[in-house]
Swiss-Prot record:
This is Contulakin-Lt1. It comes from Conus litteratus (Lettered cone). Acts as an agonist of neurotensin receptors. It binds to human neurotensin type 1 receptor (NTSR1), rat neurotensin types 1 and 2 receptors (NTSR1/NTSR2) and mouse neurotensin type 3 receptor (SORT1). The cysteine framework is C-C. Residues 23-60, 76-85 form a propeptide. It is found in: Secreted.
Length: 85
């Protein structure tokens, strides 16, 4: 959580500092994005198919954690719902 907070703070500083120098907002935001990130690359990332989870599958693989934040495991959600009934 701390990492996400500092990333957010640094992005806000990276956007607001150039604005105080008289630059436009679009230019400040574009300065945060890598040059090789094109609309075609973004489209291919967004349209990539995601595997469907089968909760009863014994060979279900746990998703990889990204940025030290792991998504909740699907079968834990189901177990929590059963306990709350």
């Amino acid at each position: 959580m701390r990492t996400a907070y500092w990333v957010m703070v640094m992005m806000m500083v990276g956007i607001t500092a150039p604005l105080s120098e008289g630059r436009k907002l679009n230019d400040a935001i574009r300065g945060l994005v890598a040059d090789y990130l094109t609309p075609q690359l973004l489209q291919s990332l967004v349209s990539a198919p995601y595997p469907e989870f089968q909760l009863d599958d014994p060979n279900l693989e746990i998703p990889v954690c990204i940025w030290k934040v792991c998504p909740p495991i699907p079968w834990r959600r189901r177990d929590l719902k059963k306990r709350n009934k």
